């Protein structure tokens, strides 16, 4: 095991593919901590770590980064982001990945429990809501210390599409997407706005039509699939990486950001013992609060359909 001179927080990234490599790079850019990049492909992890390290004199960022295939190197990590798993190919749904990726998550969870039981764990592997529950069950970590990255990404996609349609800065748009990370996610139109002006009011002002909003909702639901079909040999990684790092930053620096994430519900929204996308506050204690919104009858119906789909998917893990 290689010794590290820990200058700050220790962050372990399990999986050094496109998302894992990009997360490692973003962590260095933002100086969030020292990075252990772990992958069963030892050469890939070490190669990407070295490449990122060699960029540090240009980017003027400090801290350690190294690649490994040894789980002992994640010992006492403060935070862990899991991206390992097979990715979608054209024609595949996220759900097609279940059996293979559950076995991968099981091995990872066992090693996290052994070497870093106090870490805050962010799961990115798809199908997200299934994998984060598998992580919880096999690692036995407290539920407040495990979350899934989904809603941040879905909300970002929705915000981007709205911004492009209205020809406004993406910085002006706030949006919120709940439910499962898939075709039955729930973009909450009434909680989405442009510089404080609700989407409903923008429709009344004639700046966007209801049909166009509906079209954007559907495109958001198919956002990952759209990128998979274009890339043909992989799935999205820039936006997922940014999303995971935003969550990580909120935890490490106790920012207490309210973010839509897949969190363990114990009766909130009428759901028990499942990870579902809802607004949460992430701080130094992990998931510090689950924000329970009052949904309309229509919203609740879509949300419950999303929950039912997740329940079916997790039945055999």
UniProtKB/Swiss-Prot annotation:
Q: Where does NAD(+) bind?
A: 15-20, 39, 101, 124-126
Active site positions: 181 (proton acceptor)
Query: What Pfam family does this protein match (any one)?
Result: Ldh_1_C
Q: Which residues form the signal peptide?
A: none
- The answer to whether the entry has keyword NAD is yes
The UniProt entry, under CDD domains, shows:
LDH-like_MDH
GO terms (molecular function) for this protein are:
L-lactate dehydrogenase activity; L-malate dehydrogenase (NAD+) activity
The residues listed in the UniProt record as binding substrate, with positions renumbered to this chain, are: 88, 94, 126, 157
**EC numbers for this chain:** 1.1.1.37
Q: Which UniProt keywords apply?
A: NAD, Oxidoreductase, Tricarboxylic acid cycle
Biological process terms in GO annotation? lactate metabolic process; tricarboxylic acid cycle
Highest taxon in the source lineage: Bacteria
Report the catalytic activity: (S)-malate + NAD(+) = oxaloacetate + NADH + H(+)
Q: Which HAMAP family match?
A: Malate_dehydrog_3
What is the documented function of this protein? Catalyzes the reversible oxidation of malate to oxaloacetate.
Q: Which family does it belong to?
A: Belongs to the LDH/MDH superfamily. MDH type 3 family.
Protein name in the entry: Malate dehydrogenase
Native organism taxonomy: Bacteria, Pseudomonadati, Pseudomonadota, Alphaproteobacteria, Rickettsiales
